[in-house]
Amino acid sequence: VDEERFRTDRQEMSVSGGVEGLQNSHRGRSPEELFAWWRDGAQELAHAALSVDLSKRCAWYGPSMSARSMLTARLMETWAHGLDIADAVGESLTPTDRLIHVAHIGVRAMGFAFVTNGRTAPDEEVFVELLAPSGETWTWGSPNASSSVRGSAYGFCCAVTQRRHVNDCGLTVTGNVAREWMSIAQAFAGPPGSGRAEGQFS
């Protein structure tokens, strides 16, 4: 892991237009070239991940985070943007139990979702119960909590990555805290996302 190179790249990106500047610099590439570029980067990341201490703090574009959290976030982003691509070309993604990583970061980001929307993060716990693609049940929190979110793992992941409007995700949301959370749920870093319109993909 070359942290010095990352810091240099981060500095260059900050003065060259950020993500939008990066996008513009690649707009002339063919789909095949873009895919090869992405694949090379993904393989480099996977190779680096094999040797990193998962508890080690890693520099990032936002606050530093543990290597484990950073890699989980990359899985979440890859899945979410993969769904964007599938939507754009009229295809669908087959859900797998690897969605547990996306769901986990979505649950862990509940407090962040409130803060980034200028709200106070609640002390109250929310129970989350999801049906995995394999039929297994995943849970977070206490089943005795007064607020809960239940449904499919796929629907929950679509909601917390804002790839579908929460009302289109087939979730059962009970309690004031859970309802408020799911209206602003955001697993990704940065300012509040614009999300998707209700019924946009129906």
Model regions and ranges:
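A glycine-rich, hydrophobic loop/mini-helix early in the fold
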Residues: 5-21, 42
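Structured surface interface patches that mediate subunit assembly and partner/cofactor docking
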Residues: 2-12, 27-28, 36, 51-202
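A short, structured beta-strand-centered segment in the mid-to-C-terminal lobe
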Residues: 20-41
